[in-house]
Amino acid sequence: MKSINKNNSNLLKLVFSGLSAALICLATTVFIVPLPTGGYVNLGDCFIILSGCMLTPMYGALAAGIGSALADVFLGFAIYAPVTFIVKALMAVTVYFITKIACTKTSPVKILNAASASAAAEIVMVSGYFFFFFIIYGYAGALADVFGNIVQALFAVAASVMIYSFMLKSKLFDYADNIINKNQKGAG
């Protein structure tokens, strides 16, 4: 019976990861505001941050990496898909560890914690892409790309904190956690 419960828990995590990857891809490709620098602002990072809050590091990283890399492919930026996979996966892992380490039961502190985790994840994003562009295009090319990434980061932090607050008040995190981990608690 324990293996069935563990398998169900793993299946639910896999399903939530797949749904998260699809939402990340959709939010990245549909909700776009083009920037003059050639990049664009989107809601994808918000869902990466939420995936990092709800899923384990491995499942959150896979959802973030796959969803974002697919979005790059669909939008015609396939050359960036591998680095996007790595950067976005690291973002989700960053969010997971910050939210789990500093987790408290009071809502205002949870929201502040989510804002800190979001900001840290976006620092990972800006730094990751800067490093990549520095290797490929040199310092000038990397510097030219930073502005768009910072705008994306600021937007993502603000939007993800608003979405996180809504999900916290509506108990959606508790609901998702109960579904994903309900059998795991009894299986241990």
Each language-model region and where it sits:
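Loop-helix junctions at membrane interfaces
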Residues: M1-G188
